[in-house]
Amino acid sequence: MSCWFKKCEDGLNHTLFSTTGTQDIRFASNERLLVYGESKSIFNTNRLFRDPSAWYHIVVACDTTQSTASNRVKLYVNGTQETDFETNSQPSQNYDWNFNHTVEQGIGERVTTAGLNPHGYLADFHWIDGQQLDPTYFGETNDNGVWIPKKYTGTYGTNGFFMEFQQTGTSANSSGIGADTSGNDNHFTPTNLAALDVTEDTCTNNFATLLPTVRHTGTITLSEGNTKIVTGTDSQNSGKYSTFVLTSGKWYWEVKQDVNLNTMGLIIPSTYKDNTTDPSVGGMSHYYAGIYRQYNNTVMKSRNQSGGSNYNSTVTGGSNSIPEISANDIIMFALDMDNGYLYVGTNGTFHNSADPANGTNAFNLPTNYTEGMSPHIEGDGGTAHINFGNPAFSISSGNSDGKYGNFEYAVPSGYYALCTKRLAEFG
């Protein structure tokens, strides 16, 4: 088996592949990678996998006919063989897995136990029948020393398959999300999946999401691949920021508000503090810039970390006040980190007659913005979807940045989606 996976949450079981007889490959709730079969843990790594911004390449290579026990099952992560295990108990010689038999097989579920579905992104899923292949058949190291996928050119065997997850249908055929493109037509039936679950966020182009490990007060729940946020009224001024910290370049994203939010825009992660780590802070404290709702008014505002006080930054040629934002509105953000400007719009129109492409009527960022800023959402009972180019809500029009991303409204010229392809070019 070879696949790529990006975790969205710790403390859960994330099943990659399973079959009957309690045989599966998964990230366990203790953040270790586990291979289970023959009624036991074959491998349980000492290494912990906790990075919600990273894609992991997992290869499990099996040949139980090997006389040397240590050669029967091999586990690789990002091209390197795992050898440090909490549990290492190789299967018996000639052990017959259920994976290649006519029994139920599950990608992204544990077929014998409900509730172990992964919270994350899955891509480039190969199952090779009859061969024990190492990672170099599926990946390679690029010029920057990063392990990346490459095209597999070998055969799949009778029961093998390749899932590219490029289709959007919900049936077990060539148009379905579970389409097998190996040529074997071993199609899988999508369950509880829809077209919106197919995303551009892949191992070849990693998109920003909200960062689940950000400390917060109150109740905050992330879902839809960490692009939807639901905040409790007990969350006060607490929220989540993105997995990308931006220090240069020009960037565009959108937020669809479902239930009124308290604040949305940007923060400087290096200034982020809360009262669990700093008793002098009365709740949350950080520099931010963006939309702030207070006393039924919506304004553009910046916050100074010192004492948690607020201050209005300037809007060149315009006003800090903006129209009230309602449910289902889509808020547009264009960030110019090269010049220290932020532009905000609603439903296709930038406020204060701003023009990000020409650099006019901008909102000025905090003076220390060069420390790096991240898109950010605060709640106090609000709900929203954030779209960095990988939307988890329906897009009626479809606009890219010229090459990547999918947005409701046109991306200003010279601005780009928050993805690794664009960061490499312009970040």
Predicted segments, located by residue:
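Short hydrophobic/aromatic patches on beta-strands that form ligand-binding or substrate-lining surfaces
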Residues: 1-9, 58-60, 107, 122-126, ...
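Trp/Tyr-centric glycan-recognition "aromatic platform" motifs on solvent-exposed beta-strand/loop surfaces
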Residues: 19-48, 285-316
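Extracellular glycan-interaction patches encoded by glycine-rich segments
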Residues: 39-43, 96-122
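Acidic glycine-/aspartate-rich tracts in secreted/extracellular proteins
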Residues: 6-12, 39, 63-68, 80-82, ...
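Secretory/extracellular carbohydrate-interaction modules
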Residues: 5-14, 233-296
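Extended recognition patches within non-cytosolic domains
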Residues: 67-69, 74, 83-89, 121-184, ...
